[in-house]
Each structure stands twice: as structure tokens, then as C-alpha cells.
Amino acid sequence: MSASVAEPPPALSRKAEFKAAKAELLARFKSANHVTPLMHALSRATDDALRSLWQECGLPATLALVAVGGFGRGELSPHSDVDILVLLPDAHASELDERIERFIGMAWDLGLEIGSSVRTVGQCIEEASHDVTVQTSLLEARRIVGSTALFERFMLRYREALDARAFFQAKVLEMRQRHAKFQDTPYSLEPNVKESPGGLRDLQTILWIARAAGFGSSWRELDTRGLITDREARELRRNEGFLKTLRARLHVIAGRRQDILVFDLQTQAAESFGYQPTSAKRASEQLMRRYYWAAKAVTQLATILIQNIEAQLFPATSGVTRVLSPGRFVEKQGMLEIAADDVFERHPDAILEAFLLYEATRGVKGLSARTLRALYNSRDVMNNAWRRDPRNRRTFMQILQQPEGITHAFRLMNQTSVLGRYLLNFRRIVGQMQHDLYHVYTVDQHILMVLRNIRRFAVAEHAHEYPFCSQLIVNFERPWVLYVAALFHDIAKGRGGDHSALGMADARRFCREHGIEGDDAALVVWLVQHHLTMSQVAQKQDTSDPVVIKRFAELVGSERRLTALYLLTVADIRGTSPKVWNTWKGKLLEDLYRATLAVLGGAQPDAHSELKTRQEEALALLRLETVPPDAHRALWDQLDVGYFLRHDAADIAWQTRVLYRHVAADTAIVRARPSPVGDALQVLVYVKDRSDLFAGICAYFDRNGLSVLDARVNTTRHGYALDNFIVTQTEHDVQYRDIANLVEQQLAARLAESAPLPEPSKGRLSRLSRTFPITPRVDLRADERGQYYILSVSANDRPGLLYSIARVLAEHRVGVHAARINTLGERVEDVFMLDGTGLSDNRLQIQVETELLRAIAV
């Protein structure tokens, strides 16, 4: 008796065969540099499979199976949707419906991601007239199998109904709306290769518009038509090829449709292109820079092409032109137009003049397609001789010194690559991503954001945003000095070494070449060198210490330098990420500014006089609150000088009013209120001190989703802790007034318990932190006076991190005197002042540092 092996069902066999054929194609693609052959091969294989299913389902020859969308173009990425149209004759038997459903179901069973529609010719035309998306997908329709006559009749009706002008307007509006979803920038941390500005969809949109207008359906045809030049066509093909290849590789790596270049895939995608990490740049950073350059070129060329197509579709009536620069520029319909195509070749100094005129001429809203094209094709003119030309250096300084339009001018100079060709070191940081968990913009975009922020300080309409900064810049002479410092403060990022020192050398050279001399040049160079200093002092040092203020004042040296550094620092922090700036950081910086200004004005940083002033101000506030005279003494007699120096008069008055009747309280007193300095909750805790108190409070905040921004810990002479916290709720939109009572009750109840400290929860890291973890660092050392120990911690941010640190300190009976919690996007750089008599023992120090590193490890 012979054994027999059962044949697999036909559906399973078909699926296995198709899957094997597709796998073979993808395997070949892994070693190929170009994706177009793969896309065409996948499309052909899908055509063959669908034809086979069509015939198997016995669908009649009177119907037609039509590929639409990207499948219609004959281009399929590895896991793209397969969009098909089953085209029906006007009169058809109803029993066909069952066979069509079977066909579509079998296509799904084959493993195809089918997007299907079943319509007559009339229904297609009707649907397309109401929906530009349908109209677009039908534009590239291609017959796979079935009635040729029906398909040709459909295409004839479609072309007759297509209004090229209306289609142009609809697609341009659609593109603008799509760009708005991505904040109108290609420089996203995780760009969508297909949909983001400068992505594949922009290129497809141009070809759709051109095809609808009858101008051609390829870059070669648009070149022949005169809409683009040979050089532009080559650039478009090159960048289109890169974007298509990148998208296909994302699909292969992810094993599914994946158009977003997420952090998790950036390294693998980079390696698939052959990028290798260097000491200065990760492989992923090199890939992202290539992507941003491609997206930038696509954006620039798309602008030119769309304007050119618009000019063909909507010929302008001969409007009035205004001469702006004889023989060089005119204004035409609100756009800056070159007087002749070879203006930049004949007059290279006109290149920067174009941006000066755009910036300074009212009524000019942009550069015309003709001007943009001339700039794009004049890159060879922008050489060393052009950079050294004194006329260009004067014009560049004029652009910086205009009363308005500076931000727009510099953005346009960057978009057209002129800025990077004039400042070669700027070109090196265009499209350079910073995977420091802090900046969310590329270096060039961050620099321009900082420039924009400084400009906004000086614009009256934005004075309400940062009133103090606006007040300072009004009286700041020659504010263009700040703009130069902004341009150079991060220009040396990614070179290796200290970017502040390298940038300082670049800034000094720029000043020398552009006639910036004396105090102005010295200020620019000094600002670039010290652009991080004020932030570090305000957020990491004890600014209640007169010695800290005196040392910072000595570094600054003058009110002009202090004001310049303050304005640059605020603009810099605000230009890193929408999440990094908060009102608490603003208060720290403003307090440091005012304290330093007083010292520069001749005031001596004397602790005794400062203490007396704050006490007098606090007493005045208490009188307004009708607190009895001398009622404060019971509490104040238990407080040391440090308490009065670390708190302002308003906080001292509030805490005194709450506590003066309860100086010897038996139970914990907890009071909370919306923070006077911004969107946060201020929490006061007064209770008999114990070694695990700080950790216990942090445990409560952690369990309730409250992040600590600042902690000021005080111990009274009679053994009570008087601790003050500033906390925020970042996960949910919350009204702090509404949760104040709940925090008071819950935290007081938690402190009344004698339960041991809970195990810290290792909160989930963000995808960015998981992909680009930083090496945790712990540094523990005695301060200059030997009074406290300073603990500095740097790590990936995650829920529960502060409590993990506090618990280790509590286990070793190390008291926390003060804490500065500095969250920078996805990373933290926290500083603690510790009371730890035992820390003088080196073995204990090493043990604490080791356990802290273990606690903060990812």
C-alpha cells in the first residue's frame, strides 16, 4: 500500500508561490542600489496574479480590471496598498456581484492589501467630480485585464471631464493643507518619507498636475516642455530615486507598510545604505542629513515648478512692473523678478541683493519662479571670490541690520541654499540632526529659530509673550550683534570638540571679515563662547549664594553683556523644543539677571543685608494678610540664614502665614497652591524630620504623575523639615487649583504612615530615549566650602527617576538640602545639595555612586 501526500488547497498554493516570488524580488533588492526595477517587478508580479484570479473567477470580457494610484503607475513599494477598480458596463447582470466579491476576497487571501472600488464609467466620472482624491487616482489608470473598449471609453470620458485649472487649484490647496499638518517643515525628527514636505507626495503632486494639464508625465517630458532645465530634471530624478529607495527599505525592514522614518528604524535604514558611525556622527545622523538635503531640494524645485505650471495655466495679463534695481530686479505681481536670466552670472553681487530687496521692499511677498531658478542654477557663481567680495559682505550686514523681515530673509536664504554657500560653516550643519534628547530641530533650523526668537522680542505685536525680554531689547543698542551671535552660537556642532570654542573662532573670523570691530566684535565672540553659561548657573547652581552671583557678575563684567547673554539664553532655550521651556526656568533666569545686575550696579552681594531686606518685605506682606505683629517670631527663630536666602519674600510670607500657629505640630502640615510663577503647583511640607522624608515625598509625587521642577529642603533648629516643591502634571491637562486640596490630604496621609519606602517603578522610556540612550553619569563631590556635597546626575528621563535617586540617598541616610531638577526634553541633568557627614568616607561615596548608577540605568 503506497502512502500519498495530500496536495495543498489551491488558495494556499497560490499564496505560497506569490510569497516566494515576492521574497526573491526583495532579496535581490537588498543588494541593489536602485529601487525602480523592484517596484516595476512587484507591479508586474501583482498584475500576473490578479489576471490569474480574474480568469479563475470567470469574470466576463465585458468588464475591465484597472490599476489605479501608484499601482496604476506600475510602481509598488514592498508593502504598498494595491488599488484596483473593477470597471462595469452600464448594463450588467446582478449575479456578477458575487463573482466580483469572490475575486476581491481571493486577492486578499493571496496576501495583497487591496483597496477596491466597483463602478460603471458614469459612476466613476460622477465620483471624480466631487472628490479630488478619486480624480487623482484615476489619472494614472492602467488596464490589467478585460475589455479594452470599455477602458478606452472610460479614459476618454475622464479626460473630457477633467478641468486642468480646477485640478491644479485643488491639488495645490491639498498640498498646502498636508504641509500644515507637518508644521510646513521637512525637518521633522521622524519624517514621513511619503507625506512630509519635500517627500514623495510633493513629487507625485507635480507630475499629476502636469499630466492633467497635458504637459507630460515624467521629468524628461517637463524638461522638453521647458518647465524645468536639464540640471533640475537630474536633481529631481536623483532625489526621487533616493526617497523611493528609502521608503522601500523601510517597508522591508519593518516587514509591513512603514512610511514614517521612526527612531527605531533609522539606524537599520542607515546601515542598509552603507552608512557607518564615526566618532562625530551616528550612522542614523548621516542618513537623516541626506534625507533633509533631499527634502530641501524637492521643496525648492517644487516651488519653481508649481509657479511655472501656474503661469502656463493662468497666463497673467501684462501687469505693471516696478523697477527695484535697474538692470537687475523688478517687482511683478508682488514677486521679486530678475530683469534677465543671466543677471546673477553678470552680477554675482545681485544674489544677496535679491534677499535685501525681498526683506526691505514693501509689497514683495516672495521670489518668482524665474528668480528661484536663476539662484538654483547659479550655485557655481557662489565661490570663494564671491564670498570674499566686499560688496557681498556689506550686503550681508545690511540684511542683518534691517528693521524688519530678517527672519523671513534668512529662512529664504537657507531654503535656497544661499546662506550655506555664503557661510560655508553653516552649510556643514544644514540638515544635521542632534540626537541629544534635547533639541528637536536640525542645527540649522535651531539657529534660525533662535534668530527668530530674538527678533520677536523686538516686535511690538509679540511683546506680551516675554514682556521682560521685550523691555530689555528696546533699549539695547545695535541688536544686530545678537543676530550675529545667534548665527554662530551652534555653528560648530558636529565637528568634534567644544562647539563653543570652535564657534568662537568662526565668529571672530566673521567679525574681522565684515568690519565688526571693537566692543561689538568682542561681545559677539564672548556670547558664542559663553552662550551656555547663564543657563547652567541658573539651573544647576545655588543662586541664593552671594558667592555664586559674585562669580557670575565677574565673568559678565557689564550690563550690556549681561542683557545680551540673557536675551540669547532665553531665545536659545525656547528654540530647542516646545517642551523644554517653562515659566519656572524663566523665573530662574530672570532672578539671576536681576541679582547680577544689582552687583554690576555696585551692590555688594552681602548675605546679611539681603536677609534683612527679604525679612522686611515679608513682614510687610504679612501685615497685609492681618497676621498679628510678632506672630512670625516663633517660626523665624527656628530658621537659619540659608532659608531666608533661598526663598523670596512672597514665599516666606506665605509659609509663615500657614505655619506660625503650628510651629510644634504633631502631624504633618501640607499646603498646596497654584505656583505664583507659572503653570505649576507649589507644595509646602512641614513635619518632624526623618532620613527618608524626601524620598517619601518623591514617592508620592511619582505615584500620582507629578514631576518635580524644584525642591528646597530646610531643617529647623528644633528638628522639623520645612520643604518647598514646585511640581507639574505633564500627562494631562489639569487645573492646579482643582487638585490642590487632594494633594494636601493625600500627601499628609502618606506622611502619617510608617510603611517602608515602596520599590521604585522603572517607568517606560520614550521611543527616542530607547533608540538613543545616553550614558548615565553621577558625580559626587564636596562643594568649595566643604559645607555640602554636590551630586550631579545625568540620565534619560523616565517616570520614577527622581524617586529612584531619593531612595538610594535615604537608604544611606544622606539628607537632601536642595534639588534643582533640570529636564531637557528627553534627558535630565539634576543637581542636589546633600547633607551627608558620612560622605567624607571614600568607600561610602563610591558605594552611593555605584547604587545611583544602577538606579538610573535604562
UniProtKB/Swiss-Prot annotation:
Uridylyltransferase (UTase) activity is inhibited by glutamine, while glutamine activates uridylyl-removing (UR) activity. SMART domains: HDc (SM00471). Residues 1-324 are annotated as: Uridylyltransferase. Residues 325-681 are annotated as: Uridylyl-removing. InterPro entries: ACT-like_dom_sf, ACT_dom, HD/PDEase_dom, HD_domain, NT_sf, PII_UdlTrfase/GS_AdlTrfase, Polymerase_NTP_transf_dom, UTase/UR. Its EC number is 2.7.7.59, 3.1.4.-. Residues 443-565 form the HD domain. SUPFAM superfamilies: ACT-like, HD-domain/PDEase-like, Nucleotidyltransferase, Nucleotidyltransferase substrate binding subunit/domain. GO terms for biological process: regulation of nitrogen utilization. The keyword Nucleotidyltransferase applies. Modifies, by uridylylation and deuridylylation, the PII regulatory proteins (GlnB and homologs), in response to the nitrogen status of the cell that GlnD senses through the glutamine level. Under low glutamine levels, catalyzes the conversion of the PII proteins and UTP to PII-UMP and PPi, while under higher glutamine levels, GlnD hydrolyzes PII-UMP to PII and UMP (deuridylylation). Thus, controls uridylylation state and activity of the PII proteins, and plays an important role in the regulation of nitrogen assimilation and metabolism. Has four distinct domains: an N-terminal nucleotidyltransferase (NT) domain responsible for UTase activity, a central HD domain that encodes UR activity, and two C-terminal ACT domains that seem to have a role in glutamine sensing. This is Bifunctional uridylyltransferase/uridylyl-removing enzyme. The lineage of its organism: Bacteria, Pseudomonadati, Pseudomonadota, Betaproteobacteria, Burkholderiales. The gene is glnD.
